[in-house]
UniProtKB/Swiss-Prot annotation:
Gene3D superfamilies, sorted: 3.30.70.60
NCBIfam families assigned to the protein according to its UniProt record, in alphabetical order: aEF-1_beta, PRK00435.1
Family: Belongs to the EF-1-beta/EF-1-delta family.
Keyword Protein biosynthesis tagged: yes
InterPro entries referenced in this protein's UniProt entry, alphabetically: eEF-1beta-like_sf (IPR036219), EF1B_bsu/dsu_GNE (IPR014038), Transl_elong_EF1B/ribsomal_bS6 (IPR014717), Transl_elong_EF1B_B_arc (IPR004542)
Protein name, as recorded: Elongation factor 1-beta
Pfam families: EF1_GNE (PF00736)
Amino acid sequence: MVAMVKVLVVAKVYPDSVERNLEEMVENIKKSLPEGYELLQYQKVPVAFGLNLLKVYVAMPEETEGGTEKLEEVLKGVEGVSEVEIETVHRMSY
């Protein structure tokens, strides 16, 4: 049996305002992810002056053409997202 290899991508997702509902953003991110991608967990991280960002942990297929580019585009397309920064990428298998 061949193990399916995925990568774990940790990304910082910045909201467009302090008032943005981060739980709603998480739900929209889940709905927006393509087949084969999975939001494993997320954290709210304080930035400054009441602004929080989302740190999202997404599993995606390793053999994705363009690497994390597709994921970045999907995340940037979610309502309320102003910026996306890929923090780390780790290979995982299960």
